[in-house]
């Protein structure tokens, strides 16, 4: 009833979402008047897989994962986190891995992306910024980026600068703040929303991780702010 239209899940495990089957989860969301949009989940590579560059076994996990997400009605699967790799070779292996995951998602009618935090603005081997390397070495046909604008700012960078440097790569945005959206004043939302066409944005996801009031009021305040700036 507040005005939110879709849900992004973050609890996929062994074929289920929050302990529910894909169909049960889909029905629960739709009963609330919303649709299932996306999900945060991932499967990391072992040291052995990184050393060999062979991630065949890891892809078997994704086959089940993709099937469950498709059954739940998801449009997008997003990897929410990757620690800073020790070497550029390891980072390249992850880029190759993500390209293959994205290819499998595409074959199933889904899209695959990566969500940043602040640590991706560190350099790997003191040579390459992690996020830039990933943007440059993943295939836009298979991998989009879900920019978390709060973490970009916390990483001392400008979301709009990244929109201009890598146009069309940011299919989704995580709109987030220190607490309720818009309260800290540290994120320049006006400039961000004026440049969404350049970024390639199709969906905006509101995320509130910390609350200064009861959760229902917190998410309402965040939506009220977004509505105020005409989102």
PLM segments and residue spans:
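Conserved small/polar residues in nucleotide/adenosyl-binding loops
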Residues: 229-231
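Conserved, mostly hydrophobic/aromatic
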Residues: 7, 29, 69, 112, ...
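Long hydrophobic alpha-helical segments typical of transmembrane helices together
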Residues: 185-226
């Amino acid at each position: 009833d507040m005005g939110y239209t879709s849900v992004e899940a973050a609890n996929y495990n062994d074929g289920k979402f929050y302990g529910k089957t894909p169909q049960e989860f889909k029905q629960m969301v739709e009963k609330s008047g919303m649709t299932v949009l996306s999900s945060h989940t991932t499967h990391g590579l072992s040291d052995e897989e990184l050393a060999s560059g062979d991630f065949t076994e890891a892809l078997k996990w994704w086959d089940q994962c993709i099937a469950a997400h498709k059954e739940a009605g998801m449009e997008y699967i997003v990897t929410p986190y990757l620690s800073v790799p020790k070497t550029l070779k390891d980072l390249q292996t992850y880029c190759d891995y993500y390209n293959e995951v994205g290819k499998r998602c595409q074959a199933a009618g889904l899209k695959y992306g990566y969500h940043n935090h602040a640590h991706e603005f560190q350099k790997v081997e003191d040579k390459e910024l992690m996020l830039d390397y990933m943007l440059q070495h993943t295939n836009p046909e298979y991998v989009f980026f879900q920019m978390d604008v709060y973490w970009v700012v916390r990483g001392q960078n400008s979301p709009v600068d990244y929109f201009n440097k890598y146009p069309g790569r940011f299919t989704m945005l995580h709109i987030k703040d220190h607490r309720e959206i818009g309260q800290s004043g540290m994120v320049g939302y006006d400039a961000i929303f004026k440049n969404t066409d350049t970024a390639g944005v199709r969906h905006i996801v509101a995320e509130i991780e910390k609350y200064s009031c009861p959760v229902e009021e917190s998410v309402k305040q965040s939506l009220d702010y977004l509505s105020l700036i005409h989102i």
